Amino acid sequence: MINKFFSLPLFLLISFSAFADHPKEDVEKWLAKMHHASHMINYDGTFVYGQNNEMTSMQIIHSVGKDGELERLISLDGSGREVIRSGDTVTCILPDQKSVVVDKTRPDSEFPPKFPLKIEQLSKVYDFHFGKDGVVAGQKAIKLMIVPKDEYRYGHTLWVDMKTGLLLKDHLVGKNNEIVEQFMFTQINYPESIDKERLLSKGENKKYTWYNAKDFDSKKDASGNMSWKVESLPPGFVPDIKRHHNMTMTDMPVEHLMFSDGLSSVSIFVEKQMKNSKNLIGGSTMGAVNAYGRNIGNYHVTVVGEVPHVTVKMVGDSVKYIDR
């Protein structure tokens, strides 16, 4: 899938007495079933994705066989955009930009979204509750609510296919129980097999410009001996990724750090300021994604993630460098 690009939630104050409480083992059972279904079964369906009062329809074809895990996402908005995933390689075909981008998949960009299998650490910053069962895309679904204990992360309301375990619907929930992002299958099938031809893109064009994301030698990083650190993180967030690489379409070197609580994550990008560059200063919001930017000396720092604004600002303001 194409990489995606608030105050204390009021719903934390709501009594959960009406919800059916289940042991931790039941929650983990369903998370494991979701994980298995998203990677280990064939499915073919149509879903809608929405944010900022805008909805987009997409078709997904997912196959597991002798060639491993293959997936094709097709935009139904007329743009011709497609995403092909084969193992851990993702190819994005963008006809409107006459380009093809090849990258490695990351857990935070997978569809359906990837959820942790164990909740011991998550339980420190989230509560888990089962709600009333429902029906999504004609399938009976169990309802699972993941509720944050503070203002630094969003919650999730999940509807999971009772038979297969596939995640059929997800509401990303912010303050005042506001839905900041959502997806929902409108039609779903589980075929025994899928013709490989259906997983091949019809939109690739040799005249398109191809971009291959490649990590580069960190010794060549523009920041030299300078090391970056984050002095203040929300509870539960720990280091997840630290790497140096070139920006896919500009080839500019950037240092990338990611912190995660196991469900929510924030990424920090540090790059050398370029002359006449229009860098983000302050905050920006696009649906569930918040970003915050500031300059530190000759460098620009951008923090971005599917987390509330208070989180990216807290992290961004605490980024420091040590000149060794």
Residue ranges of model-derived segments:
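Intrinsically disordered, low-complexity linker/loop segments enriched in Gly/Pro
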Residues: 107-156
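Short, surface-exposed coil-to-beta transition loops
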Residues: 55-59, 78, 152-156, 168, ...
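Short, solvent-exposed recognition patches
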Residues: 208-296, 309-310
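Bacterial N-terminal signal peptides that target proteins for export
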Residues: 1-7
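Gly/Pro-enriched, hydrophobic low-complexity segments
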Residues: 137-206
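Short, hydrophobic/aromatic-rich segments at coil-to-beta transitions
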Residues: 40-44, 66-72, 138-145, 166-169, ...
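An acidic-aromatic
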Residues: 61-113, 172-184, 190
